[in-house]
């Protein structure tokens, strides 16, 4: 999804 989705999944 977004550029930070890989660590902002929560």
Curated annotation (Swiss-Prot):
This is FMRFamide-like neuropeptide ALAGDHFFRF-amide. Coiled coil: none annotated. The keyword Secreted applies. The modification Phenylalanine amide is found at residue 10. It is found in: Secreted. GO terms for biological process: neuropeptide signaling pathway. Signal peptide: none annotated. Keywords: Amidation, Neuropeptide, Secreted. Belongs to the FARP (FMRFamide related peptide) family. It comes from Mytilus edulis (Blue mussel). Disulfide bonds: none annotated. The lineage of its organism: Eukaryota, Metazoa, Spiralia, Lophotrochozoa, Mollusca. GO terms for cellular component: extracellular region. The keyword Secreted applies.
